[in-house]
Amino acid sequence: MNTPIKDFTDNYAKSGIIRAHMPGHKGKFPLTEFDITEIKGADSLFEADGIIAESEKNTSEIFHSYKTLYSAGGSTLCIFTMLAMCLMNGKNRRVAAVRNCHRSFLNACVFLDAEVEWIYPEYENSLVSGKITPEAVERAIEKSSPACVYLTSPDYLGHITEIDGIADICHKHGVMLLVDNAHGAYLNFIGEPPMHPNYHGADMCCDSAHKTLPALTGGAYLHINNPKAEKYEGYAKEIMSMFGSTSPSYLIMRSLDECADFMDTRAGKYFNEMKLAADKVKSLLSPVWHIEDTEAGKLTLFTPPCGYTGTELADILREYKIECEYADHTHIVLMLTGLSAEEITYKGKGISNLPQPSIFVPT
């Protein structure tokens, strides 16, 4: 696959041209030679019709979306944009949202003056995770007649919501389904059909490429899928420009461009090997440790049955040179995407060798 942003910045870095433009580093410091601004030929993220538009089209084909737009402001920018696109007519400010959402959704609702009808997941060991059913979504739609339904899948502990049934309910009522898939960009390469929301009825969704793919922090995608969403597509870039920086990082955009080439040529084999290694580690640990049923790229342990709090276990693993993604009183989460099979196996063995505290159970 061609990499137009990478190719342009490579050629510019080699050109020897005097950079009488921003940024102030002028490409003379480490990591800065490819960091440019909207010079001639470099396109512009929010008015893309050149190399950025071409790169976005490449990524859209990989994700089988109607349209994919780049964000250098993470999924936060995509979430603000999705909600604004749904609420832009001003007639309906209501959003039905699953309560275990990221704070960027809350911030967007405050900024956009949205009215939220909360959908509460069924409690399952944690306040940040829980099962959500199509029936619960339908009750919320019938109660509030929202402009859209918003859910997070995978959630922070790695649990995936069955989106198909929820999408059917939303579309039966003529309501848009928005999915915060920030932790699940790599799901485009797992399963048949892939587990990514694009394949299961999401009208729009966001991916934080930097969370699970080889992209720089802040690199994200906004996917537009449903024909009903197409009428908003022309406004998407304009809305993104309202919330995003007018100086989006070319290093981030270059990394998204190179990521497209990685996904096109190597991602299928890479993530299949990761899943096989992760499955082996989960099988190794499951006889002793309480392993949650999660997405392939997360190893989530429910720690109380093993005599630890999640934060205690995180401190112990740090001594083994393993830094986890998240820990609280009851859970610990390790992200496996981006690791080699050997690194995943090392993590598993490190956990399996930990001593089990004795737990006194009164009779």
Feature locations, PLM:
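N-terminal "arm"/small-domain region of PLP-dependent enzymes with the aminotransferase-like
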Residues: 1-50
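Conserved PLP-enzyme active-site core in the AAT-like
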Residues: 2-9, 62, 74-290, 303
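Conserved N-terminal alpha-helix of the aminotransferase class I/II PLP-enzyme fold
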Residues: 32-77
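Short glycine-rich or small-residue beta-strand-to-loop segments that form or flank ligand, phosphate
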Residues: 42, 69-71, 149-152, 333-337
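Conserved C-terminal alpha-helix-loop-beta "cap" of PLP-dependent enzymes
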Residues: 283-363
